[in-house]
Amino acid sequence: MTANTLLVELLTEELPPKALPRLGETFATKIAEGLKARGLAAADGAFRWFASPRRIAITMAGVAAEAAAKEVTEKLMPVAVALDADGKPTPALLKKMEAKGIPASAVPAFERRMDGKAEALFHTAVVPGARLAEVLAAIVHDAVKALPIPKVMRWGDGDATFVRPVHKLVMLHGAEVVPGRVLDLDAGRSTRGHRFMSRGEIDIATADAYEPTLLAEGKVVPDFAERRADIERQLLAEAARLGAQLDDYTDLLDEVTALVEHPTVYVGEFEAEFLAVPQECLILTMRANQKYFPLFDAAGKLQNRFLIVSNMRMEDPVNIVTGNARVVRPRLSDARFFFETDKKHKLDSRLPRLANVVYHNKLGSVLERVERLEALAGKIAARLGSDEAAARRAARLAKADLVSEMVGEFPELQGIMGRYYALHDGEGAVVADAVQAHYQPRFAGDALPAGNVAAAVALADKLDALVGFFGIGMVPTGDKDPFALRRAALGVLRILMEAPLPLDLAALVADAAAGFKPGLLTADGFQAQLLDFMRERLKNLLRESGGEVAAIDAVLALAPTRIDLVPAKLAAVEAFRALPEAEALAAANKRIVNILKKAEGAPGEPDVALLQEDAEKALFHRVIEIAPLVKSHVANEDYTDALCVLAGLRAEVDAFFDGVMVMAEEPLTRQNRLALLAQLAGLMNQVADISRLSA
């Protein structure tokens, strides 16, 4: 069977840039899977995917024109039904053979073998392999249908649907066109190149010539990764030539790669007077609206230059450079206007307008929320022994920039602009910084708010949201989390654990709930539900940080509410697990838990006078001896030392279970031994539920 390189390309109108890489990769992957499933390509066959603004494509080497034939054996029916007493085929067998296209002459070749408890007839036939020319169109059609496209469109007079109009379909196997029709288009070998730098149609001679032909004749770099790498090389080279630096550009680089087919980087410039506007505004304007790459000096200060990724390569790029500078100037002027206009009104004066901004129809306005945040942030700051007045002031101003001109135009700048306006209004740096930082952490790996005042406001903001929405029954389900409550929960946990802050989570939740008007939060048991939700988030957070699963489960089984102490407890449990006594003590603890579950009523305190066996006396006295030391270590947060002391109980615990019948027939003896085990369990499980460590 002739094997050759296969090319499939869809030429389209400009595809959605943010979805382009996924469209290209999925399209190619699904075609490769279809070829492999039909035996036309090796199971480990490699392929390349291509994606540019106007095309998605795949090339795959070693694709056969026809798959190898294969033997297929299928069960027909039980012999008792298939053959009569003389061994001749019954009408039932003949009917089935006719339906399957098996000639009557094939009966003698049928195989008889046991199938379960009955003998059955089996037919083996050689099935011809799939032919590429007959199945490729169906494979491409299925790949198109499998693309992650939320909305499709129709064009022209046909019924085909796709994310954008499709103009050409190329399907080549080696040098031969593979016939087929997909999306109302007949397959061919012609495509088009760059919209401006190439003219007319381009014929692809062979599948292997696809990439070099597009580059040479079409002025298109079809490989997404290659185009991205080329843009990055040019960006870094230009920045180095100018003695400037780029900041984090990954997302913008991906987007720009999806917007150009023949990238060239040029340097643009704007008037230095615009640098009087906060640089975050200018950066966002250049990135979001113009897709420019801002340049910075070594200190991270914005320069009045930027890099342009053009879709054209020109010998004299002056028109491109001046044109882009001309386009960005009105944007920067708008930003300056918003900034100057906003500074005319103090943040304080904007608060009444928040009464007209609905936070949630069941939770009131943003102004009502601000009043809750102010009270809660003050309480948290007081618990921390921090500046309560500063925390209350920062919380009061935290949402005022939501009704500013700048944030109205660029919502991403909320908090950032609040800080600038607070400083302009004469607020202290601590208050202004907290206004900006109260949104942090906004995503995984984001910085935490610096300082206790900022942390207090950030906690208040997130706890108010969590308590409010849980209190009205708006709980995240599955992958639906419209109010970003999972993110808020992780933010609270990270602040408490990483700052760290000596605050009780249950008390914080109760404080937040107390700030709402009576009767507003009506969901049953919502505080307990919220704490369970946050513990589940904490479990995931600890696992992602590399914590041992069993150790995490052991620590969280005690439902700790001092989140700041969890890392130390986790480290102590992981150290304890490495001790030779750990497994035996964990197993004993598990046994104790099971015994106490079956006991009737509370065991009470053990009575030394009722102890009979030497082993139980030894255990009792050992527990009494080490209990103060364990409790002292726990009180001092020396959890590793506490567990090491407990490891010394192994000999007494082993001896107790080897020589003492806990469930004695005499009731007082039985109850006393249960009381001793309860006392032991209470001592052993002050740091974590040790029974969870048992295999």
Curated annotation (Swiss-Prot):
UniProt-recorded name of the protein: Glycine--tRNA ligase beta subunit
Lineage summary: Bacteria, Pseudomonadati, Pseudomonadota, Betaproteobacteria, Rhodocyclales
Record key words, sorted: Aminoacyl-tRNA synthetase, ATP-binding, Cytoplasm, Ligase, Nucleotide-binding, Protein biosynthesis
Location within or outside the cell: Cytoplasm
Broadest EC class assigned to this enzyme: ligase
Disulfide-bond pairs as recorded: none
Principal localisation: cytoplasm
Gene Ontology molecular functions: arginine-tRNA ligase activity; ATP binding; glycine-tRNA ligase activity
InterPro entries documented for this protein: DALR_anticod-bd, Gly-tRNA-synth_bsu, Gly-tRNA-synth_heterodimer
Positions in coiled-coil regions: none
UniProt cross-references to HAMAP family, sorted A to Z: Gly_tRNA_synth_beta (MF_00255)
